[in-house]
Amino acid sequence: MSTAVLDPARVGQGSGDATGPLAVRTDGLTKRFRSGQVAVDDLDLRVPRGAVYGFLGPNGSGKTTTIRMLLGLVRPTAGAAWLLDAPVPAASAAVLPRVGALVEGPAFHPYLSGRDNLARLEAADATADPRTADRRAGEALERVGLSAAADKRYRQYSLGMKQRLGLAAALLRPRDLLVLDEPTNGLDPQGTREVRHLVRELADAGTTVLVSSHLLAEIEQVCTHVGIMRTGRMVLQGDRSALVAHGAARLRVTTTAGTAGEAARVLTGLGLDEVRVDGVQVDALLGSVRPEDVSVALVRAGVGLAGLEVRSPSLEEIFVELTGEGFDVAR
């Protein structure tokens, strides 16, 4: 039984299909470490203005290194990058005040409170207005649900609280671009939902959000555009709806007890690929077969048909379809 393969050229592999103004752009961005390891390889990243761009990939795929290069924390080996039309790192000093960032493993003073840590960040920012610093710090802490712990020492914070403080630091002032590296790391399900809500709220207000994650299912719920990395290279990127539309649709047949095996034989006989039986349900790649033809064939074969559903693939299924690999989310 053959496996259907998604054509990468049709789904925006490499340079992607973004048109119009870009908030983030890289051309051939590459980072090779002294050890010889290539962490990012010839990356063409395209993040449209106003988008929520899910920058996805397994751990170790090059996402954090890319973000560090964009923010001037790591110097690229080759290639070029722009944030909000400004070349970086050449114009970083001018453009970074318009960019909020949460980079993996944010560092704060362990013996200062959350509120005092934000005050130190404000004092170090020459572009910040000291007259509104206290108010903005309070608003940022409230926005991330940390008001009750604002005066606790950072060293007493849990991992999730530390992550929330990092988010608060990125939100001290209105930003044109927000870069979030694994923002749900350490958060419980409620905290994860709050981050998704916050991202939507920021996008509705006109902020472009670049959010990296190894959790496809979480980011898929909020992003408008996606780019998926693997071993330092872009596997695909573009408008999320368009990517999903180009993926191979899957069919789920729900049978009455005792007829799932016969249903699987019928689907295989019709030429459907990746036929899998799970209890009374049978899943398969639909391919070019019409759902109505499947229904007729099942009924004729005496299969007890309780339901038939056609669904679009998830981003994880598209990744597997393109690469033949599972999306390893182990930390």
Stretches with model-predicted labels:
Residues 2-10, 19, 286-331:
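C-terminal coupling/interaction segments
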Residues 21-230, 236:
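ABC transporter nucleotide-binding domains
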Residues 27, 254, 278, 309-311:
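Solvent-exposed beta-strand sheet faces enriched in polar/charged residues
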Residues 195-285:
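ABC transporter nucleotide-binding domain
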